[in-house]
Each structure stands twice: as C-alpha cells, then as structure tokens.
UniProtKB/Swiss-Prot annotation:
GO biological process: endonucleolytic cleavage in ITS1 to separate SSU-rRNA from 5.8S rRNA and LSU-rRNA from tricistronic rRNA transcript (SSU-rRNA, 5.8S rRNA, LSU-rRNA); endonucleolytic cleavage to generate mature 3'-end of SSU-rRNA from (SSU-rRNA, 5.8S rRNA, LSU-rRNA); translation
Gene designation: rps-21
InterPro entries xrefs: Ribosomal_eS21, Ribosomal_eS21_CS, Ribosomal_eS21_sf
One annotated GO molecular function: structural constituent of ribosome
Name of the protein: Small ribosomal subunit protein eS21
First and last residue of the signal peptide: none
Family in the record: Belongs to the eukaryotic ribosomal protein eS21 family.
Length: 88
C-alpha cells in the first residue's frame, strides 16, 4: 500500500511470541504485549531507552502458561532474580 507521499508502507507488522517463537497473527486478539521499564527513583518517570518488551501469543494465554512464560523470560533477562519466587 502507498501513502499520500507515494511511499510504500505496510499495514501490518508481524510479531513473534517471545516465549514460543510463534508468529502472532493479525486475528490473534488474545495476544498481549507487555513492556517492563526502568523508573527513575527520584522523579518516578520512565527512563528513556530502558525498557524490555515481551509479546505473548493467545495460545499460551489459553493454556494458562503466560505467567510462567513471562517469569522465565524476566529471569533470563535479569529483571527478576532466579530464586525470587521459589517456595520453601
């Protein structure tokens, strides 16, 4: 498709699930995208460029695996310590 300036633009940019690497289709309305950001402790505002984005497909959400997938990804990226949520 072309815009008014004659440049070719895409209407849909496909995403991949961060956990399963499945392509998230345009009709997957159950898919979510979550951004975790670093916050300045003094101002309470987001620090630009310091964010981590995860996309979770609807299939994982339907199976009830999205919380485990996000926790595993956050632990891999160092957002959550590996032993943080282990029960005794």
């Amino acid at each position: 498709m072309q815009n008014d300036a004659g440049q070719t633009v895409e209407l849909y940019v496909p995403r991949k699930c961060s956990s399963s690497n499945r392509i998230i289709g345009p009709k997957d309305h159950a898919a979510v995208q979550i951004d975790f950001v670093d916050v300045d402790p003094e101002t309470g505002r987001m620090i630009p460029g310091k964010s981590t984005r995860y996309a979770i497909c609807g299939a994982l959400r339907r199976m009830g695996e999205s919380d485990d997938a996000i926790l595993r990804l956050a632990q891999k990226d160092g957002l959550v310590p590996r032993d943080e949520l282990k029960s005794n």
